Amino acid sequence: MNKEGRAIHSLLVTGYKAHELGIFQESHQGVHYLKKTIENRLRPFIEEGTEWIITSGQLGVEQWAADVVFSLKETAYPHIKLAILPPFEGQEANWSQAAQERYAARLAMADFVECISKRPYEHVGQLRQKNDFLVQRTDGLLVLYDEEKQGSPLYYIASAKAQGKPIFYISPEEVEETVRQDQYDDFL
Protein backbone atom coordinates (compact mmCIF):
# COMPACT_ATOMS: atom_id res chain seq x y z
CA MET A 1 0.00 0.00 0.00
CA ASN A 2 1.18 3.52 -0.66
CA LYS A 3 1.01 6.29 1.89
CA GLU A 4 -2.60 7.12 0.92
CA GLY A 5 -3.60 3.50 1.51
CA ARG A 6 -4.03 2.72 -2.20
CA ALA A 7 -2.66 -0.47 -3.68
CA ILE A 8 0.57 -0.39 -5.63
CA HIS A 9 -0.48 -1.89 -8.98
CA SER A 10 2.80 -1.08 -10.73
CA LEU A 11 6.10 -0.99 -8.86
CA LEU A 12 9.33 0.42 -10.23
CA VAL A 13 12.31 -1.59 -8.95
CA THR A 14 15.82 -0.20 -9.13
CA GLY A 15 19.05 0.16 -7.23
CA TYR A 16 22.74 0.20 -7.85
CA LYS A 17 24.37 -0.89 -11.06
CA ALA A 18 26.49 -4.01 -10.63
CA HIS A 19 29.79 -2.14 -10.78
CA GLU A 20 28.62 0.29 -8.07
CA LEU A 21 28.34 -2.75 -5.78
CA GLY A 22 31.74 -4.11 -6.83
CA ILE A 23 30.08 -7.00 -8.66
CA PHE A 24 31.62 -7.83 -12.02
CA GLN A 25 30.43 -11.42 -12.51
CA GLU A 26 26.91 -12.88 -12.35
CA SER A 27 28.42 -15.74 -10.33
CA HIS A 28 29.44 -13.37 -7.49
CA GLN A 29 27.94 -14.74 -4.26
CA GLY A 30 26.44 -11.34 -3.47
CA VAL A 31 24.04 -11.67 -6.41
CA HIS A 32 22.33 -14.62 -4.69
CA TYR A 33 21.74 -12.60 -1.51
CA LEU A 34 20.60 -9.51 -3.39
CA LYS A 35 18.08 -11.56 -5.37
CA LYS A 36 16.83 -13.24 -2.21
CA THR A 37 16.40 -9.85 -0.51
CA ILE A 38 14.55 -8.46 -3.54
CA GLU A 39 12.30 -11.52 -3.51
CA ASN A 40 11.57 -11.05 0.20
CA ARG A 41 10.50 -7.47 -0.48
CA LEU A 42 8.50 -8.20 -3.66
CA ARG A 43 6.35 -10.97 -2.19
CA PRO A 44 4.26 -8.70 0.10
CA PHE A 45 3.67 -6.23 -2.74
CA ILE A 46 2.43 -9.02 -5.01
CA GLU A 47 0.25 -10.46 -2.26
CA GLU A 48 -1.29 -7.00 -1.74
CA GLY A 49 -2.17 -6.59 -5.41
CA THR A 50 0.89 -5.44 -7.34
CA GLU A 51 0.46 -6.67 -10.90
CA TRP A 52 3.41 -5.14 -12.75
CA ILE A 53 7.09 -4.87 -11.88
CA ILE A 54 8.85 -2.26 -14.00
CA THR A 55 12.58 -1.74 -14.66
CA SER A 56 14.71 -0.05 -17.30
CA GLY A 57 16.83 -3.18 -17.60
CA GLN A 58 20.12 -1.64 -16.51
CA LEU A 59 22.86 -3.96 -15.29
CA GLY A 60 22.70 -4.77 -11.60
CA VAL A 61 19.67 -4.61 -9.34
CA GLU A 62 17.21 -4.03 -12.18
CA GLN A 63 18.23 -7.16 -14.08
CA TRP A 64 18.40 -9.22 -10.90
CA ALA A 65 14.89 -8.03 -10.04
CA ALA A 66 13.79 -9.27 -13.47
CA ASP A 67 15.24 -12.70 -12.65
CA VAL A 68 13.34 -12.69 -9.35
CA VAL A 69 10.08 -11.87 -11.14
CA PHE A 70 10.65 -14.72 -13.61
CA SER A 71 11.23 -17.11 -10.71
CA LEU A 72 8.20 -15.90 -8.74
CA LYS A 73 6.05 -16.12 -11.84
CA GLU A 74 7.11 -19.73 -12.33
CA THR A 75 6.80 -20.86 -8.71
CA ALA A 76 4.14 -18.85 -6.90
CA TYR A 77 2.61 -15.89 -8.73
CA PRO A 78 1.81 -16.74 -12.37
CA HIS A 79 -0.17 -13.50 -12.71
CA ILE A 80 2.74 -11.13 -12.02
CA LYS A 81 4.06 -9.28 -15.06
CA LEU A 82 7.40 -7.68 -15.89
CA ALA A 83 7.92 -4.66 -18.13
CA ILE A 84 11.42 -3.66 -19.21
CA LEU A 85 11.55 -0.11 -20.57
CA PRO A 86 15.11 0.77 -21.62
CA PRO A 87 15.89 4.48 -21.87
CA PHE A 88 17.01 4.29 -25.52
CA GLU A 89 17.70 1.85 -28.35
CA GLY A 90 20.86 -0.20 -27.90
CA GLN A 91 21.28 0.33 -24.16
CA GLU A 92 23.43 -2.81 -24.12
CA ALA A 93 25.76 -1.82 -26.98
CA ASN A 94 28.84 -1.30 -24.78
CA TRP A 95 28.25 -4.25 -22.46
CA SER A 96 30.23 -7.48 -22.58
CA GLN A 97 28.99 -10.22 -24.90
CA ALA A 98 27.86 -12.30 -21.90
CA ALA A 99 25.92 -9.35 -20.43
CA GLN A 100 24.29 -8.69 -23.81
CA GLU A 101 23.21 -12.32 -24.08
CA ARG A 102 21.71 -12.33 -20.56
CA TYR A 103 19.94 -9.05 -21.34
CA ALA A 104 18.50 -10.44 -24.59
CA ALA A 105 17.22 -13.50 -22.72
CA ARG A 106 15.58 -11.32 -20.08
CA LEU A 107 13.96 -9.13 -22.73
CA ALA A 108 12.60 -12.25 -24.44
CA MET A 109 11.01 -13.42 -21.18
CA ALA A 110 9.50 -10.05 -20.19
CA ASP A 111 5.78 -9.46 -20.65
CA PHE A 112 6.32 -6.03 -22.17
CA VAL A 113 9.41 -4.36 -23.67
CA GLU A 114 9.60 -0.93 -25.25
CA CYS A 115 12.35 1.67 -25.42
CA ILE A 116 11.36 5.02 -23.98
CA SER A 117 13.32 6.85 -26.67
CA LYS A 118 13.24 5.25 -30.10
CA ARG A 119 16.71 6.62 -30.78
CA PRO A 120 20.18 5.49 -29.69
CA TYR A 121 21.99 7.25 -26.85
CA GLU A 122 22.51 10.92 -27.67
CA HIS A 123 22.77 12.79 -24.36
CA VAL A 124 22.45 12.40 -20.60
CA GLY A 125 19.02 14.00 -20.75
CA GLN A 126 17.65 10.69 -22.03
CA LEU A 127 18.54 9.14 -18.66
CA ARG A 128 16.77 11.91 -16.74
CA GLN A 129 13.76 11.50 -19.03
CA LYS A 130 13.79 7.75 -18.32
CA ASN A 131 13.78 8.31 -14.56
CA ASP A 132 10.92 10.81 -14.69
CA PHE A 133 8.93 8.73 -17.20
CA LEU A 134 9.16 5.50 -15.19
CA VAL A 135 8.41 7.16 -11.85
CA GLN A 136 5.44 9.03 -13.34
CA ARG A 137 3.90 5.85 -14.74
CA THR A 138 4.26 3.68 -11.66
CA ASP A 139 2.63 3.73 -8.24
CA GLY A 140 5.77 3.43 -6.14
CA LEU A 141 9.52 2.87 -6.10
CA LEU A 142 11.36 -0.06 -4.49
CA VAL A 143 15.04 0.83 -4.38
CA LEU A 144 18.22 -0.72 -3.01
CA TYR A 145 19.99 2.31 -1.60
CA ASP A 146 22.42 3.33 1.11
CA GLU A 147 22.41 7.03 1.98
CA GLU A 148 26.09 6.73 2.90
CA LYS A 149 26.95 5.44 -0.60
CA GLN A 150 25.30 7.67 -3.14
CA GLY A 151 25.10 6.46 -6.71
CA SER A 152 22.78 6.07 -9.67
CA PRO A 153 19.62 5.26 -7.62
CA LEU A 154 19.70 8.81 -6.25
CA TYR A 155 18.25 10.13 -9.53
CA TYR A 156 15.21 7.85 -9.30
CA ILE A 157 14.76 8.80 -5.65
CA ALA A 158 14.88 12.52 -6.48
CA SER A 159 12.29 12.04 -9.22
CA ALA A 160 10.01 10.02 -6.92
CA LYS A 161 10.27 12.66 -4.18
CA ALA A 162 9.52 15.45 -6.67
CA GLN A 163 6.46 13.56 -7.91
CA GLY A 164 5.25 12.61 -4.43
CA LYS A 165 5.53 8.87 -5.09
CA PRO A 166 6.05 6.44 -2.21
CA ILE A 167 9.60 5.15 -1.88
CA PHE A 168 10.33 1.78 -0.29
CA TYR A 169 13.98 1.30 0.56
CA ILE A 170 15.99 -1.91 0.66
CA SER A 171 18.83 -1.15 3.04
CA PRO A 172 22.28 -2.73 3.23
CA GLU A 173 21.20 -4.02 6.65
CA GLU A 174 18.35 -5.97 5.03
CA VAL A 175 20.80 -7.60 2.64
CA GLU A 176 23.10 -8.44 5.56
CA GLU A 177 20.13 -9.98 7.41
CA THR A 178 19.38 -12.11 4.34
CA VAL A 179 22.98 -13.33 4.37
CA ARG A 180 22.79 -14.18 8.09
CA GLN A 181 19.44 -15.95 7.71
CA ASP A 182 20.63 -17.91 4.69
CA GLN A 183 23.79 -19.00 6.48
CA TYR A 184 21.76 -19.94 9.55
CA ASP A 185 19.37 -21.99 7.41
CA ASP A 186 22.35 -23.74 5.78
CA PHE A 187 23.77 -24.49 9.23
CA LEU A 188 20.57 -26.22 10.37
Swiss-Prot record:
One Pfam assignment: YpsA
InterPro entries: YspA (IPR010697)
Family under the similarity heading: Belongs to the UPF0398 family.
NCBIfam families (alphabetical): PRK13660.1
Name of the protein this chain belongs to: UPF0398 protein ABC2016
